[in-house]
């Protein structure tokens, strides 16, 4: 997987690429991350890449030519071009999984100021937002996408690790505990110490459903449940009504 990021703040990504899973994925060559400074593609002697908005308006807009010229240089037939924008689809685990499994070359455009010249949109394959709020620039959102996608690339982390993550199976993750077993009467559920893997699996399934029902019931609306999950969910609802 090659991920290329077009930004006016290339130094923003330095520490990100030198930390944790991203650093390991780069060292193991599971992913390549290339940062492109948009200002290099400016024809202005001051390397300016923004300008005032035609028709009037507050703020500055990132110009079309630098984005266009950069894309002309790095885009290939295999590229998937993503614009980070508050107007885009809300990014979720399904997007992350699809990008990790189906794409080999992602180009991420980071917007700033009032956004980008609308002419760039005809070269975009997807507009993505990380939430219904506005950030100063797309750089923070870019790190969210890169992190979420990279950890799903085969070989970056153990498959079992992400298969049990919240949202990967359409449910929130069950509660987890570690040592000590008892601390000032705050105890770990005894079933987790039983060694009975079937009961532990069932407990985790039930707790996952319970947490999802209580915190994110919207996730259950379109979730296709197994017969076991349907039975457990019915039990949970009955217990909560008592």
From Swiss-Prot:
| Alphabetized Pfam families for the sequence | tRNA_m1G_MT
Give the EC number(s) listed in the UniProt record: 2.1.1.228
The highest taxon in the source lineage is Bacteria
GO CC terms: cytosol
- The entry's S-adenosyl-L-methionine-binding residues are 111, 130-135
Gene Ontology molecular-function annotations? tRNA (guanine(37)-N1)-methyltransferase activity
- Alphabetical list of InterPro entries matching this protein: Alpha/beta_knot_MTases (IPR029028), tRNA_m1G_MeTrfase_C_sf (IPR023148), tRNA_m1G_MeTrfase_TrmD (IPR002649), tRNA_m1G_MTases_N (IPR029026), tRNA_MeTrfase_TRMD/TRM10 (IPR016009)
GO terms (BP aspect) = tRNA N1-guanine methylation
Does the record's keyword annotation contain S-adenosyl-L-methionine?
A: yes
- Supply the enzyme class, top level: transferase
Q: Which SUPFAM superfamilies match?
A: alpha/beta knot
- Keywords noted in UniProt: Cytoplasm, Methyltransferase, S-adenosyl-L-methionine, Transferase, tRNA processing
Which reactions does this protein catalyse?
Answer: guanosine(37) in tRNA + S-adenosyl-L-methionine = N(1)-methylguanosine(37) in tRNA + S-adenosyl-L-homocysteine + H(+)
PANTHER family tied to this protein: TRNA (GUANINE-N(1)-)-METHYLTRANSFERASE (PTHR46417:SF1)
State the family named in the UniProt similarity comment for this chain: Belongs to the RNA methyltransferase TrmD family.
Describe the protein's quaternary organization and the partners it interacts with: Homodimer.
NCBIfam families given in the database record: PRK00026.1 (NF000648), trmD (TIGR00088)
Query: What is the name of the protein in this document?
Result: tRNA (guanine-N(1)-)-methyltransferase
User: Organism source for this protein?
Assistant: Aster yellows witches'-broom phytoplasma (strain AYWB)
